[in-house]
């Protein structure tokens, strides 16, 4: 199935608020909080990006790191803590760690790109999507092909998913096997602008890459892009989505092109 078969994907280009727009002045220090996501929505964002972990007792939280330490006033691995302890933590010293179901309920008009960060989050994620009938509101990806395959086994084709790491490598570095991706279960290639290989910085996103992905009926979403000149270049190449921490700057770039709200 192609991206066109999934209501999740709006006509491009679309802007995605990375962790709610972690680099926006109002969101500094409070990434992945309901307050940060509210800022993005207030700017007109319909697409939010977040990550999920599961607590020791199976609660699914919208949180990037494996540990609480970097962004909260508590310490410890989320997987080792019960929800009541994670719930007591404050991001930036003031905002609670949200559960994914709270995010879905707080912003019913938003579509959410979800990165599975841990194996224990796979089943709770599917259960949360089912409980909220959010099949058309989410796209699921992961840096782990194993986690992504496990999610697809549960969800089948009901939920849009990203091409895994194998798909990313094949599309850019293995042109002789690109044709095999015509049957990829993913609907979107999520990719950074560059990648370092053996000390060399390689440009990943080119017009040839974008055109190739489009031929397979997939979209191209690029992360994490915070410079307006880079945003302009990528849009000129025909990418379908840009994931950004600087949601204010991305909004301005899209608005100048007459593509806001996206």
Model-derived regions: residue spans:
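Phosphate-group recognition and catalysis centered on beta-loop-alpha active-site segments
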Residues: 1-262
């Amino acid at each position: 199935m192609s991206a066109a078969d999934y209501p999740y994907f709006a006509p491009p280009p679309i802007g995605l608020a990375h962790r709610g727009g972690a680099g926006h002045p109002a969101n500094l220090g409070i990434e992945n909080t309901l307050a940060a996501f509210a800022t993005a929505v207030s700017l007109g964002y319909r697409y939010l990006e977040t990550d999920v972990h599961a607590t020791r007792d199976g609660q699914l939280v919208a949180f990037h790191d494996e540990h609480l330490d970097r962004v909260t006033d508590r310490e410890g691995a989320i997987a080792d803590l019960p929800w009541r302890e994670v719930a007591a933590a404050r991001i930036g010293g003031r905002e609670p760690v949200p559960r994914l179901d709270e995010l879905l309920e707080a912003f019913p008009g938003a579509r959410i790109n979800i990165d599975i960060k841990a194996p224990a989050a796979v089943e709770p994620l599917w259960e949360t999507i089912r409980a909220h009938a959010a099949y058309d509101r989410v796209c699921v990806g992961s840096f782990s092909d194993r986690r992504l395959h496990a999610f697809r086994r549960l969800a089948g084709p009901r939920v849009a998913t990203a091409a895994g790491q194998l798909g990313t490598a094949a599309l850019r570095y293995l042109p002789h096997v690109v044709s095999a991706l015509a049957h990829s279960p993913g609907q979107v290639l999520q990719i950074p602008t560059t990648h370092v290989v053996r000390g060399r910085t390689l440009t990943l996103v080119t017009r040839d890459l974008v055109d190739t992905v489009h031929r397979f009926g997939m979209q191209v979403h690029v992360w994490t892009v915070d410079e307006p000149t880079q945003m302009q270049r990528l849009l000129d190449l025909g990418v379908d989505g840009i994931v950004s921490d600087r949601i204010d700057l991305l909004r301005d770039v899209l608005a100048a092109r007459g593509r806001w709200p996206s």
